[in-house]
Amino acid sequence: MLLLATALAAVVVLHFFGLPASLPLWGLGLLILVIFRDPERDIPSQPLAVVSPADGRVTSISTTRDPYLDRDSIRVTLKMNPYGVFTTRSPVEGKVLQPPSSHEDARMPHGVWLQTDEGDDIVLVMMRGRLHTAPHCYIRIGDRIGQGKRCGFIHLGGQIEVYLPERSRLAVTVGDRVDSGSDIIATLQHA
């Protein structure tokens, strides 16, 4: 809608004032296209795989306490590329059991608890973007979401944390570049 309004304004300005006056609006339209682009991704057909929720780089991997589920876990932190795609995707297929609920920490309201059909718990945390704009989360309690499906948007990128079960096998290392929905960051392990 925003793109359509910008294009219409550019055409009107072009008609009445000429090309030089309309160039800023055409530039704005191009910027909107770049910021809101959302390419299709090839989602791997591996049921126990955990795919990257965002385009970016792995900045840290640590064993830590999951503040949402109060359990020991592996935390994979991703820094989104400021010029990349800003759509976030579900790392696993499963059911949303807990919406953003904690108000103790400014980062915590954007945590989502996903439980797979096998009973594995994954927490996806979307943190504020570079302009401190709140992430948009499109999923709610009780929703079922597919692996690699769109679940949110962070304006101009930000940081994402994925809390995995402690027994997960990692497929990435610090410094790796990953694409949302298509690159595997871990595999869930069952005894």
Task: Report the location of each language-model feature.
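Contiguous, well-folded functional domains in the mature portion of proteins
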Residues: 1-191
